[in-house]
Each structure stands twice: as C-alpha cells, then as structure tokens.
Amino acid sequence: MAWKSIETKHYEERDAFFRGLGRVSRRSFFKLAGVSAAAALAKGLVTPQSFQLVELAWAADDGGQAKPKFTFAYISDAHLYEQKLNDRFVRAILKAVDDVNALDPQPDFVLFGGDLAQLGQPKELTLGRDILKTVKAPVKMMVGEHDWFLDMGALWQQYFGPTHYSWDHKGVHFVTIMSVVEKDFWTARGMTPMQRMQTVAGLDNGVQSRFEVGEEGRKWLSDDLAKVDKATPVVVFSHSPLYKYYRPWNFWTDDADDVQAILRPFQHVTVIHGHTHQLLTNRIGNIQFHGMLSTAWPWPYAPEGLPKLTVQMNRADPFDQFDGCGDGAVDVLENGLANALYNLWDRNPITVKASYVASDGGQDRPPTTKLPSF
Amino acid sequence: MTKTSGLALVAALVVALGGGWLARSRAEAPHHAVPPSADGNLVVGLCDGVTSAEVQGVKEGERLTRSQAQAVSDQLMEEWRRKNPQANWDDARAVHVAQAAQGGALEQSVPPPEGSRPGASIKFGGAGAAEGAREAAQTKQGGAPQGQTGGGAGGMPAGPQGPVQDGHTYGAFSQRDVDIWKAATDEFVAQGDRIFHSADLLGGTIGVSCDMCHPNAANTHPETYPKFQVQFGRVALLRDMINWCIENPVRGKPLPDDDFKLRALEAYILAQRRGVPLEYGKH
Amino acid sequence: MSRQTPRLAVLAGLIVALPFVSRADDASVPKLPLGISRTLYEVSVPKGAEPTPEKAALGDKLFNDKRLSVNDGVSCATCHDPQKGFVDHKPLAEGVAAPKERTKRNSPTVLNAMFNATQFWDGRAPSLEEQAKLPILNPIEMGQKTPDDVVAKVRKVPEYAQAFQKLNGREPTYDDIASAIAAFERTQMAGDSPFDRFIAGDEKAIDASAKRGWALFNGKGRCTNCHAFGTTSPLFSDQKFHNIGIAAHKTDFIGLARRATTIVRSGDLKQIDEVAIQSDLTELGRFLVTKQSNDIGAFKTPTLRNIAITGPYMHDGSMPTLWDVMDHYNKGGVPNPNLDGGMQRLGLTEAEIDDMVAFLATLTSDRFAAFGKHEMARQRGQKTKRPERDTDAAMGRKGNLGDLAPNPNLKNPAGIGVILPPKS
C-alpha cells in the first residue's frame, strides 16, 4: 500500500502546477533548514531576524572546525496505534517523513529513534514499517520499549534485524544499542504479555523495572568499541538516555555509570537518545547527550533531575497536536562532535550546538524558554 | 488529665503490673533507689527507675500541696523528655495539618479519649501552655480544682502544653475519624488515578489517556486556576480545562458537571500537587 | 511570533494590574458600546491618547478626503467605506493604479481596529498612527511620493490649516495628520450586536440556530483558540499570526521565503509595506516582518465582529461568502509545510455550517443591521456555489487531516470557561 500523506499529494500537485507554468524548480520545495552551506553564504543570509540556519555556525572563524562533515536526520517515538483507532499519530509520522524527504541536500541516513508501535502490536509495527519504507534516504532502526515488551522483540527483530549493530561512516563510528532491557517484573506477578506491555507503556506506574543496557549489551558494546581508535568520533544511538535523569518515569538507565565508563576512553562521544519526547541536553565528562523529539506527543520536564545544560522547550499547547513534537537532524562536525537541530513543528527550529555543550553553557546558548512546564 | 494524675495512673499501672511480675520473681525485681537528700528533703522518683527530683522545703514524709506536686511532676517529666527525645509520649499538643508533602497522613495529636468531662477548657499548645492551662483553670467559676479537668481512666490526655479541647462537633475529631476520612479520600483519588490513566474510562476514542502528556499529573498546574485559558479565550477553572482536554486531545465527550468521573479526575490532579502553593492566574 | 509575546505579556500584565490601576478621571473613558469591555479600551487606548471630539472630527474629514492621494482620486474611505462596514467589498483593494494594477491584499475594516495589537494583516504597523501613514505613501494605493508632498497639500487647504492650528498651535506635520486620522478611528468602536445582548442576558436576542452555532463555535468548530471571545476580551481574536493555508495550493512558500530573506530589509517599514502590497512575496504574511520560519504564510487573526458585512474574506479576499470560509476550515485548510497545527478537519454537517454562519451573522452591530441583512441575503444566494467545499476531506474519507471527538451531549456546550454574568 502506498503511503502518501495529503501533504505529499499537494507537493505533487504543486509540482505539476509549476511545471505547467514553466517555473519548475525541484529546489523550491525544500525546507529552509536544509539550505546548503554554499548557497546560504552566497545569498548572504545573515539578516538578524532569520532563523538560525545550522550552517551559519561556520561564520565563526574557527578554521572550519565547526563545519558539518555530514548530516543525518531522525524521526522518533511515533507510538503508532492501528490507524482506524488513532489517525493522529499516523498523520504525525507522515509529516515527519515529508520533512526528511524534503530536505535538500538529502541527509546521509535517517535514524528511527524507537517506539515505532505504541503497544507492540503486529499491526502497529507493520504500519510503521510500511510508512518508513517511503523515506528516501536509508533508514537505521533503533528499538524502544513499546516495540519490545509484547512479544519480547520477536517481530521487531524479524522486521528490522538485530538490536545491536555498528557501522563506520565518513570517519565516524556509529553504534546502535538496545538500552531498554528490563529485569523480569512480570513472571512473579503472573502477567500476560499484553499486561506486561501495558505496564511498560505507562510512564508513571512504577511497576516496571528500570531500563538498562544489561550485561550482555555492555559486553557487546565493549567488544565493539575495542576495535575503535580512541580518537575516532563515536556516536551512540540509544533509546533510554544512558544517564540518570528521573527514575520514577524511567528517564533513566540503571547501568549508566558502567556504560559511560565504557565510553570514557574516547575523545568525542555523542549520545542521541529517544524516549524523553523533549528537547534535552546533557554533558557528562567526555560524552554529549542530545534527546530526540517525538512525533506523537511531548512529555513535560521531570520535577527533578533535569540536566542543567538543558534549555527547556516551551510548554506545549494541547490545542495543536504538533506543538512540542517534531523531528530533526544532527550535523556531525569536522571536529567529531555534533550539533542537534530540533525541527519543532509549529515553532521556530532550535539548534543545540556542540560548542554550547562543550563550553558547559558558556557560549551559543539556545533561545530561552518563555513558558516552562511545571 | 493532669500530669500528676497521669503520672499517678502510670505509676499505678506500673505498680500493678510490676507487682504481678514481682510476685513471680522477687529476686530480680528492679528497685529504684532514690538518692537520699542531704537535708532530709522529700525525693520523688520517676517511673523510669532512674530519674528523681528533690523537693526543696518539704521534708521526707510530708504531704505536698497540689501545686507543689504539679511542679515536681513537671520537673520530672521535663527531665525524662530530655533523656528520651525520641519517645512517643502522647501529650496534649495542638492539632495541625501538615503543610509539606510528608507522605499521606494528616499529622495528628492524640485527641481526648471518650468520656472526657465536658466544660473543661484548658488552653493547650505552644510554649507556656502549661501556664495558660493553669490560668484558664483559675478563671473558672468553682468547678474543678486548679489544673484539673477530666479525670479517671477516660480523662483527657495531658502533655506539657496541657489538655486538648473536646466536644461533639467536627473540630474535636478523633484519630479513628482521621483514619476513616483519609481512607475515603484516598479511595476517591485512586478512582481518579484509574480514570486518568485509561483512555477507555475517559471516553476517549483514539487511545490517548491523560498520563500520556501528564505523567503523575505533571504540567497540570491546578494551583494556577482560575486563570485565563488561551485555548478558550476566557477565564477557566480546572474542571473546564479537564473537559476541554477530554474533548480535544483525548477525543471523548466532555463530562457534565455532576459526573463522578470529572470530580474524580479533579481529585486526583489536586492530590498530586500537594504542597504546591496556590497561585491563581499564573502562566 | 515572538514579536507578539511581549505585547501579550504586557496585555496580560495590564489585565492583572487593572483592578489596582484604574483611570483616575473616569470621564476620559467614553461610554462604551455594549460588549466592548473597559479592559479592552484601557489596554488599547493609552491614557492621554483618548480622542477628543475636535480631533476626531478633523480625522473624519481627512479620512474621507480624496485630496490626500496623488491624483485626488482615492481617500481612506475609498477602500474603507464607512457606509459599507469600512471595507470596499472587493477581494483586493484598488488604489490609484487601478484597474491596471490592484493591491495584493484585502482591505480590513476600521471597525474595532483600534483594539488590534498591531495593524495590517501581517502586523507590520504597531499602531493606528503608523498604519495611517503607509497607504498614503504606497505607490499603488494612494500614490504620494513623500510625506512632504502630503503635508504640503494638506497645508494648502484652509479648513485643515485652521483646524490644525487650533488643535496644535502650529502647522501640521505628517505625524499630526496620521494622529488625527487615528483619533477618528478610535471612535469607531462597534459592539451593540444581538450577540452582545445575548451575552448580557437576553435569551431571545439570537435565535436557536445561532445558539447552536455559538455552541459549535466553542466546541466542534475549534474556533476559540484563535478567535477568542470572553467578556473581558471580546474581540474574537487572539491577535496572533497563523498559517491557515489560504491560497496554499498555488503558493510556493519555500521558494518565496528564500527570495524574501534576501530581498526584504527587516525594519524598513516602507519597503515591507511595498513588498506586501505589490509583490508576490505578499503570501509570506508575517514572515516579511519577522523572517522566522514559523511565520511563513501566517496572517493575523482578524476580529469576527461585523464579519457579515466585511466580506470577501481572508487576506487575499479569496473567500466570497462565510460559507466558503466554513468550507475552508471544515476540510482542515489547505495543507502546506507551515500549516498551523491547530488546523484540522472538523466534520461539520451542512446544518452545522448553517448554524455557525447564523451565529456569525449575530455579530453585526445594530447600526449596520439593515446592511447586514442585505449582505447575508446576498451571500445566502451564493450558497450553491461552493468551490472550497471538500466533503470527503471534512468527513475523513480521504486524507489524514485529523481526528474528531464524538459530538458532545452537554446541556450547554458553549458553557466552557467563564462568561461573566450580566451586571445586575
């Protein structure tokens, strides 16, 4: 079944319209966020009110250190139900697919950040898989807890392959791990698979175990990184944050300290994580952490434990299903670190730069929140 | 209940029980040897077996006046409290409701037990309560002798600050009342909890429940109502917004004002925000 | 959008502060029409800037005077006709360059314009005074080349020279002219509608269909988030900017935005005015002023008061009747990359649309009652032509344009939030 959002159909109609007028320009449909560097500089896009194009970062005279080497995009936390039950989340993921497909130039790949399904149902995973097939760039999949705990990952692995894998790309070592392993809390309680899934699906019930990478996962990571030079930039994709933010909501990785220890020897490590559905920034030692936005709904900030580097996104407006949601891109820089572009729907985009994180908030601070959640 | 009569009661109990115990094993019976006074003054021992107080100006074998006895008891109690700071002695302190989020229970003093004599009005609570108690007793027309209010086994408990007011109207509730009331309230809040977390119970048609955007009722800020609610362009109360959320993000039918579910949700949300100061109109 | 928030913060601050900061001299606040709240007046008219009768009368004359234009052919009233709801009932305004060249924007009404946080569809003018200055100098609206030309012309008219001398004790400047026009505009408050009487307690002021429409307005129609109405803030507008997808099907937003970032000089009001009125970049709306991607294609929420008599609708006048407007919203607007996330299909039936239009018709002030009836009859006559209607999209049979709630069954579906009861 061909998955085309209504927006895509309109893009096609407009394409035809302009072709008819002899004014066709493929480049016209691109979101401004994707304007390529040279073009931006050539046009002198430095007007004070223009939104922060990621590329403007290189206006600074730093010998090109902050120049992006390449970019990848992400779509995360889609939480799909079957469409006839809930069309809203489908509409949202299609919007994200349109966003990434409209980028010019196209990103090197698109990361899916986990929680493709809401309750791990076969219909949900199949729906998600079919939608993601329409993404033009290659897609890298990462598993979330909503995908796993109905059948303990059977269908996920059948569709999308192993949960732990790594690859090298343009001098950067990428690792995807599963960080939503949970110690068995269901057998003693005599839970059915659906009950287990529903327990995991609730953020605040406190019944499920805390997330962890687990011993096997950590061993896999150790072995994988053993072959990597310490100067090679490492980017880790993880669903849970790989640090300890707020335990009651499982914004938490229990063995975070151990995982961070495995990553410590490397000069430049960036962790891109999902699960938290909010703009989230942290730095622990040599590791920079960037959270991804969800397409489905935003989480409020936790009452405590918020990393001090995080500049909160504005509180979401419940009238607007897209507010507080979105997708994004990550520019991997020459120096091995990464700038995270948050493409917040219905808001101006926000870039959280590696320089901001590295300077512990001293420079390049993202715009402050007007209205925090509380 | 005054300290002296309370003390007397406890002492009597100790003797009664201790006597029985003693009867079983006279050989191991503990014996509180009060230190003798150098001047031959009366030395009174406390039931803890170690504390004692010397009464100046009263010789061994003499009777103490009421006020002297009260003063001696006070002194002994103070000494005992100093030695036992962790002791869970139920004294007649003022009732106050916990301000901070200190778990679930309302903090309570032990209210006067049943059968307390009505009309007893001894001030209690805070520093100088004992003074106040004596003052109040003094101003009474006849009635009980100074410092005495109820009596017997069912008399009012006495603490350092004095006895607790009693009565049959709401303000003189008992611990049993507190327990029942708390259970009832928590039951209601628990119902709200269930509904808050269930798209079906909310009447939602798209599988979205409140906790998806508001885990533990975060970001509901009920303490800011009434306020101008942008989503409807006018001032709103919490329940207006609950209904609006049910209609919009949750895609259910808004609940009528007298619907149990609406009230239960309100209860749950308010309960999660315990201790947060009220700040109406805050955005 | 960020430009608006300081104003909103000020507004909110003032509303909160109002119980404590009231006008010492009550005579300075004129008698307000029913439905216009004191808060709205005090927030919009700074103390000391209340119009005096002399100034307003002078402004009235200037407003209607064609000599202000370069060819003596166009006055403010040409596009903002006081007899016709202060609009011209044309889709796009036509000035001195008509018929060869029309402007690119629809004329907004002056009625209640004093209560807007900013003026123009894109909010490029911060006040009525600043707004009045721009069309006079726009090449295709009133065509004057420089402010000095205007001032010279006005000074030559003895009536004006005398009036300004009396008013200010000196010869008029361009600011004075704008100030007088603004003073006149500040007398054009319009409340006193059947809806206002209904809110004030008269159950019979509007009919059952309009009452159902009012309920839908607050519920299924999803109108109040932008077209906010409360007794303290009765403007039916949040004064923010939203992209609702008007003309999106023929607009290349991204291409236009890329051009605009290079062409438009931020802060240059005159240039932005010309770009907005004369060029195809007009469709960018608020983006021309802020250059923020969130503002691409976003236009200010207009008031709905007197909406029946201020057609055609939208920034480009592309909606001839209120039924067309309802069709546009019913299908969820026209999708485009910057469509406001609040836009979605509504699933309204024809009967519900009729009810909502009936409600909107009750927002016409009494002094225009007859004209309102006439306009509604005319629009109703065009009901069969419905180019915007897309029932399949509205009902969800095609596209992913939003989910609907089940129809509410409350006793009073409009009873959400607080409408202050009438003062007894």
Language model segments and positions:
Chain C
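Bacterial N-terminal signal peptides
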Residues: 9-19
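Periplasmic c-type cytochrome electron-transfer domains
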Residues: 2-7, 20-424
